[in-house]
Curated annotation (Swiss-Prot):
Cell compartment(s), UniProt: Cytoplasm
A Pfam short name: NAD_Gly3P_dh_N
GO CC entries: cytosol
Protein name listed in UniProt: Glycerol-3-phosphate dehydrogenase [NAD(P)+]
Sites where the protein binds sn-glycerol 3-phosphate: 106, 137, 139, 192, 245, 255-257
The keyword Chaperone is assigned to this record: no
Length: 341
């Protein structure tokens, strides 16, 4: 049995806590909202985020971050990407022994263009962390919480640590694969949200299955092109951390990114959509960061650019689709496998 802290009592943090508790581990879940923490401890539910999922009674929750970390050897950091830096700073002030840190967020910091593990490494002193890993893949918390079969990847440069995390989480409903390509895992998880937003938008526009299939296929090509340019293994984009994550995020109404894109496609304004969602839509931040990164790296990302124009430049979705359809003609396999071109 391991002593585990889960930082973040949202839908995904709660679902990860459930998997760990099912496997017999001692789980202490940290949340900022006293109301949610009290409900977890008294009713063993977290109805704001996972309304149909009773939780194991062994899961305990607290609003005291120091208490959550005390005596814990593994820390799962399950907060929005925008909170990774401030929360990591807090952890650095409170950690007294080195711990394994596994983050389960998907994003890129817009101002610095840093991946989330890079931010964690900056903010938490080396003496206070044993290793940094990322848990990512095609997972909806709503399905994990009711124990539907799910597969996911733990990516870590230290495969011995990854193996430990794999053992912690794996059970009959939750299968974990190993990957040493942290760069590819993080870029796959972050950049696919851009394509998922665009997929929701095509559905909202009523363009049908043909357009959505084309968007997803060409979308994985362009996010892989950027990821490989920035140091990722191209194989990661054909696995759970790439195409797998894209499929689940771009095709399901569980997906916040799909729902946000769908609403925009139906004519709603971005600010209204974000206000009504009540939860983070990571694809918006990812689009802003990727648009800038692509310019710096000299990588062509036409779908990302089109989405950026809609979200941040006020352009018409219909007009941007027309521009995509009338781009110069080319061979389909151009730059699909030869990413360096």
């Amino acid at each position: 049995m391991a002593n585990v802290a889960v930082i973040g009592a949202g839908s995904w943090g709660t679902a990860i806590s459930l998997v760990l508790a099912d496997n017999g581990h001692d789980v202490l879940l940290y949340g900022r909202e006293q109301e949610h923490v009290d409900e977890i401890n008294s009713s063993h539910t977290n109805s704001f985020y996972l309304k149909d999922a009773p939780l194991p009674e062994s899961i305990r929750a607290t609003t005291n971050l120091k208490e959550a970390l005390d005596g814990r050897s593994i820390v799962f950091l399950v907060v929005p990407s925008s909170a990774i830096r401030p929360v990591s700073k807090e952890l650095n002030t409170l950690l007294t022994e080195p711990v394994t840190i596994v983050h389960a967020a998907k994003g890129i910091e817009p101002k610095t263009h840093e991946r989330l593990s890079e931010i964690i490494a900056e903010e938490i002193e080396p003496a206070k962390r044993r290793a940094i890993g990322v848990l990512t893949g095609p997972t909806h918390a709503e399905e994990v919480a009711v124990r539907k079969p799910t597969t996911i990847t733990i990516a870590c440069a230290d495969l011995d640590v990854a193996d430990e995390v794999q053992e912690l989480l794996t059970n009959d409903q939750f299968r974990v694969y190993l990957n040493s390509d942290v760069v590819g895992a993080e870029y796959g998880g972050a950049l696919k949200n851009i394509i998922a937003l665009a997929a929701g938008m095509t559905d909202g526009l009523g363009y049908g299955d043909n357009a959505k299939a084309a968007l997803m296929t060409r979308g994985i090509v362009e996010i892989a092109r950027l990821g490989v340019k920035l140091g990722a293994n191209p194989a990661s984009f054909s696995g759970l951390t790439g195409i797998g994550d894209l499929i689940v995020t771009a095709t399901s109404q569980h997906s916040r990114n799909w729902r946000a894109g769908n609403a925009i496609g139906r004519g709603e304004k971005l600010e209204d959509v974000l206000g009504n969602m009540g939860m983070v839509v990571e694809g918006v931040r990812a689009c802003e960061a990727a648009h800038s990164l692509a310019k710096e790296a000299g990588v062509e990302m036409p779908i990302t650019e089109a989405l950026y124009n809609v979200l941040f430049e006020g352009k018409s979705p219909h007009d941007e689709v027309k521009k995509l359809m009338r781009r110069p003609q080319k061979h389909e396999m151009e730059q699909v496998f030869h990413f360096e071109e």
